[in-house]
């Protein structure tokens, strides 16, 4: 049987890894796919690719690959929202299947892209867009297809996890660790997407759509970064038996879908709380399987290439199948996607960690307890430290039971108005992940 011909657009870290894996494991991949896979053309701008290329035609124009009549599958690895969107739509228009590792593209333009792919009867595969080398999309879309998914939670950005691990283990401040992450290549020169939760929100949007059968709605995801976290809060959380992780949470409720990325206290004895460094993990709770955990490298040349090539093998296997019988892009049949609303963060329910800096005066705790009680907020535990020598302020740390966020917001306004409370109240959400 003739080999399937693919074109790779983008030969950076992931593109170079993909080319290397395809060359190194060509025989094994052909045995799995049922046909050989040949790289027929590469589009790249760099003069210093991350692999050795001999004999493969090269172009600087990605659209040349999308229009090449010899190519069956286009692998999009250029990143970004704009040119990548145009490239993928052009490839689909020309009847080519697409494999991509572009989470931003899928989260923002996925609904449009999938509709066009259905119209043209082609496949768009995107396992590598979420959690690098962890096949979590396949696990949710296929392995857990018997389940009604209740919730999922994930550490899905390695940069943020590296920073929080260093802050906890070595007592280092956020700016110091961020600088090291940039020097090591874990964070970009502009780290906004990583440290403000945007990258994780792209990935969470994709996972939530597959888990709950809803359209992609990245614009409704709540994002909160880790730039304001201090070593003090990391240490207080540890003393209370928790660890702070930058967590993406998607939960099905009677009112709608929670879709949120933010710093989160997790009990230290949970497996996911012990995922450290640049590693990723996603926990999924289904009504039949219960809780399952998927762990591995969330980025990197070959881990991500593993998912790209895995998708490529799946596409080759499915190329001759009836399009109506293929696994749907978002796990559910397109006409069965639900219109569940995405809840605003104020309507989401969580337990909370609150840190209050108070003057060392009698009666402050009673005032704090009264404000919380008036708003139906129950206190689970309180930790009060000695007054700090420099300013004489007493750090007061509280853990609450679960409550709607709007109630906490109202309580914080009242707490910050107290004469004996100084500065802003620190608020971090708590998830038990039972």
Describe the function of each predicted region.
Residues 262-287, 301-302, 373, 378-391:
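Low-complexity, glycine/alanine/valine/leucine- and proline-rich hydrophobic stretches
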Residues 307, 312, 316-434:
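A conserved regulatory-domain signal marking ACT and ACT-like small-molecule sensing domains
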Residues 176-274, 279-281, 300:
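Substrate-binding/catalytic subdomain of NAD(P)-dependent oxidoreductase enzymes
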Residues 58-60, 67, 75-76, 99-101, ...:
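General beta-strand structural signal in soluble alpha/beta enzymes
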Residues 1-94:
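N-terminal glycine-/serine-/threonine-rich beta1-alpha1-beta2 phosphate-ribose binding loop
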Residues 118-199, 206:
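Rossmann-like NAD(P)H-binding beta-loop-alpha module
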Residues 84-94, 103-141:
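Rossmann-fold NAD(P)-binding glycine/threonine-rich loop
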Residues 97-99, 379:
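A short hydrophobic/small-residue beta-strand
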């Amino acid at each position: 049987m003739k080999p399937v011909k693919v074109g790779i657009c983008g030969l950076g870290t992931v593109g170079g890894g993909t080319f290397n894996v395809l060359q190194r494991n060509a025989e094994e991949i052909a045995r799995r796919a049922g046909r050989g896979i040949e790289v027929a053309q590469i589009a790249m701008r760099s003069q210093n690719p991350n692999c050795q290329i001999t004999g493969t035609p090269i172009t600087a124009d990605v659209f040349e690959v999308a229009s090449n009549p010899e190519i069956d599958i286009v692998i999009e690895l250029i990143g970004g929202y704009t040119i990548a969107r145009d490239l993928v739509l052009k490839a689909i228009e020309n009847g080519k299947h697409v494999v991509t590792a572009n989470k931003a593209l899928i989260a923002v333009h996925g609904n449009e892209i999938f509709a066009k792919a259905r119209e043209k009867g082609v496949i768009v595969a995107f396992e590598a867009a979420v959690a690098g080398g962890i096949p979590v999309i396949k696990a949710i879309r296929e392995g857990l297809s018997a389940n009604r998914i209740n919730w999922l939670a994930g550490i899905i950005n390695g940069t943020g996890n590296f920073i929080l691990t260093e802050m906890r283990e070595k007592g280092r401040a956020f700016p110091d660790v961020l600088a090291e992450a940039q020097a090591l290549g874990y964070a970009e020169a502009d780290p906004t997407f990583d440290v403000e939760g945007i990258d994780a929100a792209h990935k969470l949007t994709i996972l939530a759509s597959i888990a709950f059968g809803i359209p992609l709605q990245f614009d409704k995801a709540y994002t909160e970064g880790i730039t304001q976290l201090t070593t003090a809060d990391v240490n207080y959380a540890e003393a209370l038996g928790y660890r702070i992780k930058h967590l993406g949470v998607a939960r099905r409720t009677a009112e709608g879908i929670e879709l949120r990325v933010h710093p989160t206290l997790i009990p230290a004895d949970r497996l996911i709380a012990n995922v450290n460094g640049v590693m990723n993990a996603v926990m999924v709770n289904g009504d039949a399987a219960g809780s399952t955990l998927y762990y591995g490298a969330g980025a990197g040349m070959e881990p991500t290439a593993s998912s790209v090539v895995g998708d490529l093998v799946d596409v080759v296997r499915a190329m001759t199948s009836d399009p109506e019988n293929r696994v749907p892009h978002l796990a559910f049949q397109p006409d069965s996607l639900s219109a569940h609303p995405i809840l605003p963060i104020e309507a989401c329910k969580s337990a909370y960690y609150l840190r209050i800096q108070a003057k060392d005066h009698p009666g402050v705790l009673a005032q704090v307890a009264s404000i919380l009680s008036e708003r139906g907020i129950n206190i689970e535990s309180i930790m009060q430290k000695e007054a700090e020598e420099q300013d004489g302020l007493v750090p007061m740390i509280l853990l609450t039971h679960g409550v709607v966020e709007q109630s906490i917001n109202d309580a914080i306004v009242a707490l910050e108005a107290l004469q004996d409370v100084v500065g802003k109240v620190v608020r971090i959400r708590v998830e038990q992940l039972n």
